[in-house]
Amino acid sequence: MVTEKVSLTEEEENILKESVGKKMLLVTSADDSNFSTDFNWTIYFSFEKFYIKIEREDIVAKFFDAFEDGGRPKVERISRDEIKKTSTKTINRIVKDVDLISVTAEFSNYKITCPKAIVFKFDDCNLVIEKFWLFSLAGFKIFLNSADNENFGLTDELQFWYNAESNSKKPIITQEIKAL
């Protein structure tokens, strides 16, 4: 069996940890779908004094060909000028913690462990950046999640973008977050 492990670098993990205790102001996507699809390939996070970019970086599984690639989150600290605004949502919440959730998938004689989601935790909800299909050309789905109701804690007041009614399949990561 071919075994592969893909993970964030120590530098990338440190960038994410730097956000703990800081106020996240905005989340911005370079995609023009207003966060309604899983084709968000580049996501920007604006904090009071710094900026982070999470981008889908291609990984080609040894077992698959180039057309069935996956994508891992690549995390970078950037300048404000590098943000390409298309869709923006206001967050205005202090990050209490950041979790990186990895999964292991097996296909025939191939096994890979790779990042599945990055979760920014706030007092009242979680902001989830999830790669739904490990080996697809899609990017990340971004949504708010909270254990307090069936609609992932979303309210009109928050004006967020994940609509449970339009998607009969709940995000895979939802149950894992509720269990934390």
Predicted regions and their residues:
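Surface-exposed, interaction-prone regions used to assemble/regulate multi-protein complexes
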Residues: 1-180
